[in-house]
Amino acid sequence: MYEMSGIDSLFHDRVVHDYSHTSEQVIVVYISSAAGDNSWLHQWFKPGNLSDEERENILWVRLVNGTKECLLFKSIFPSSSAPSINILQNGLLECSIQGNSLSREQDPWETFINGLQSVFKGQVTKRKLFSKSNEEYQRVKRMIQNDKLERKYVFQNTNDPQRKPQKWKQLTVTDNVSYKSQKGFLAQNYCTLQLKLPNGYTISNTFPPQTKLHKVRMWLDYNCYDDGTPYLFHRNIPRVTLTRNDELKSLQELDLLPRSTLILEPLEANNKTFDYMEQSSLLHKVYSGLTSFWAKEPEVDASSSRLGYQRLGTNVSNSANYSLQKLSSLDMVSDGGGGGGGDSMTPSAYTTPRMYPSNGTSQLRQNVSELNLSSNNSASNTKVRTLGYSNNNGNN
């Protein structure tokens, strides 16, 4: 009799509207076969074993089979039948105990309690996660409020005329390596130029910082460039074209240290700007006199005719095997000798890509003063530069 009164007092025939706001609340729906028929539930259900928390936190609903509410419930959950008891949470069916599907070995009450525990565990986990997220939210909110108060305090003190100005000690960041000293050391020792030729080749070489730019032009003309087209040096960063007056300056004066890239810009034969610059510049006349003296072709030495050197841009008629290789040692064009004076050429340990016969002699001199230029070969219509070198017999 106690159990009957407990079941009748536990389940509600209609859902109270006050419970509609509890979307996450656990709902237990009991579907009876007929009105007032609780015989199936009395066989196993033990309302006295429920705790007060389960009684208060769970919404207990009873539906009669065939009623409008029961038909609506079955349309949402077609698997439910009469008699049955169903556990819902968040609109999902978590556990269902059907009266006709239970076996004798299966205890309905144990199944019901296990279903409630699994649902409550999920609720506890969600509550913990929600509490943690809420704590984090509150912490961030407090930090924002404190930051606002701090900025407000600083702003008020700044506008206060009676407030004494506070001197802040500026922090200086020091490093073990001084950039200026390192830059000065690199600038005093070498200047690496990367030269981009009009034919697509890119070569690089290292020069002393006091080398004039016209010496770089001479080194380039005698070693790499033989197109015959006049050209000027163009600097990409900053975008500037170096004139003939600039070529009388050193690499250090042109701010090309420690490394820079120069692009060769070919000029057309009828370029008026180039012709006007050549005719009107007094410095160019001096430069032309100097270059005409250096560019005079000496006579061909028979002892040096064994080493053939093909420069870039020439028309080679024969099919000689030329390969792009790196030399083990190159010379640099210099305006200062080993002692800091004179006009001698100082050897360099840096290597530069060079095009030369694959079976040629490994010894190669790059200094302009040591180059012997042969005349054009009329038989093969091939322009070949022959480099002079010192053989073992001592002949030049």
From Swiss-Prot:
Q: Where does the UBX domain start and stop, copy by copy?
A: 186-264
Q: Where is the stretch described as Disordered?
A: 333-361, 374-396
Task: Identify the keywords attached in UniProt to this record, alphabetized.
Answer: Phosphoprotein, Ubl conjugation pathway
The UniProt entry's GO biological process terms, in alphabetical order, are: ERAD pathway; sporulation resulting in formation of a cellular spore; ubiquitin-dependent protein catabolic process
Give residue spans, biased composition: Polar residues. 382-396
Q: State the GO CC annotations.
A: endoplasmic reticulum; nucleus
SUPFAM superfamilies in alphabetical order = Ubiquitin-like (SSF54236)
Q: Which residues carry this modification: Phosphoserine?
A: 369
Per its UniProt record, what InterPro entries does this chain match?
Ubiquitin-like_domsf (IPR029071), UBX_dom (IPR001012)
- Misc. remarks from the entry: Present with 1340 molecules/cell in log phase SD medium.
Protein's name in the database: UBX domain-containing protein 6
* Species per Swiss-Prot/TrEMBL record: Saccharomyces cerevisiae (strain ATCC 204508 / S288c) (Baker's yeast)
